[in-house]
Amino acid sequence: MSLATLSTSDLILRVFVDGIPILPEFSNQIRRVEVESQVNLPSSCEIEFTDPDLLIPVECGLEIGNFVEVRAVTGDDAAGEAIFFGQVETLEIQFENAGGRLSVVRAYDASHRLLHGQKTMGYPMMSYSEVAEVVGAEHAIITEAVPHPVVHEMVVQANETYWDFLVRLAKEIGYVVNVAINPLTGTPTLHFGPTMPAETAPPPIGIDPSPLSFSIGDDRIINLEASVSGSGITAASSARGWDQSLGLPSLGEAPTLSDTSLNTVLPEELGAELGGVNQFVRLDRLAGNEAATEAASEGLAARLSGAYANIEIEMRGNPSIMPNRAISLADAGLLTGEYTVTSSIHTFAPNLTGYRTSLVCSGLEDRTLAGLQDSAVTSSKLTGVYSAIVTDTEDPEAMGRVLLSFPWLSETYVSP
């Protein structure tokens, strides 16, 4: 029997070390377990013990470098459903007047291997998917990379971590990166590919609803907040580049369509209504040919359109909720539809709320504090050497100056 068919009140989160559940004398001291996952970010797990002698992590095998697994289980199904598999990276002690001494264990999934150190590397004549496969193999992570048709003459990892490198490549073409547990093999797998289409969500019908289908008033839901917004959205997105072999600019354009949020409101219509003829033009990376430019414009459109709808739900424990899975929402007015989960948090507090799950369906931007900090950092744009065309050599002051046009930047812009 699937865990999803059982009452959520029967579910708890259990901690395993090397495939064996930790002893009751240790598990009974668990104060909180929290597993947080998000596309384009490593998954993390935090386990908090009430620990008067501050020895539990060592005694139960949760030492730095050891592997830990968290599963949602019931009394009848001790194997349960895995929601986290990773490696312990941090041990911490805390003290509270009310709670006494606490030991805290923090672990991260296999993607943490891609965050150690920075490197400069070149990958000649490869697609981004092929690069992801090479990186995964180099770090001994099983990788599933959805093929992408554009082959680049050279893909450069420019003094950055492998993880930041893969996320940058994925964002450019509308892909996502995350490590998930393969439900068939139980092994952590690095996924590099498009987001799961919202249309794959199960329909919200039937006597026994799917664990991925919900409706307003559902007794599984504790809190729900949903919104739709056209703020900052344009009807189309474009990317520009320069084809060095042809000596011509390349331009890609894609409509703002979303396959991660499907409801009665269309982001393209919102962009046309609020933004008029304006377009969002991507200039942070100069694409090298027409195919790369087209892929970049499609990736930008996917990122913009994904953020127009925002769904946040807190519910009773549900191990089926994971990033890059599709859910359906019924009886929600104009927000009735299907959505792709971008982040989830599974929390188990045995003496307080029990097992709870929360999810967010929104855009692909990093909403963590680190992501907000990075977004606030300003940097100089368009610095370096770029292609230009001389358009006017008649300097009125005879100082040998010329005017330059940058057709990859704009059809009309000319240097002052």
Specify the residue positions occupied by each region the protein language model found.
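Assembly/oligomerization scaffold segments
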Residues: 1-117
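Amphipathic, non-transmembrane alpha-helical segments in extracytoplasmic/periplasmic proteins
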Residues: 45-49, 107, 116-144, 157-181, ...
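Acidic, low-complexity/disordered segments
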Residues: 5, 319-387, 392
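Acidic, small/polar-enriched beta strand-loop surface segments
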Residues: 3-8, 12, 20, 188, ...
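Short, basic/aromatic beta-hairpin or loop at an interaction surface
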Residues: 36-48, 291-309, 409-416
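Short, solvent-exposed secondary-structure boundary/capping segments
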Residues: 92-107, 186, 347-362, 396-404
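Short alpha-helix capping/helix-loop boundary micro-motifs
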Residues: 49-58, 306-316
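Short beta-strand-centered interaction patches in the first periplasmic/extracellular domains
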Residues: 2-3, 102-111, 147-225, 231
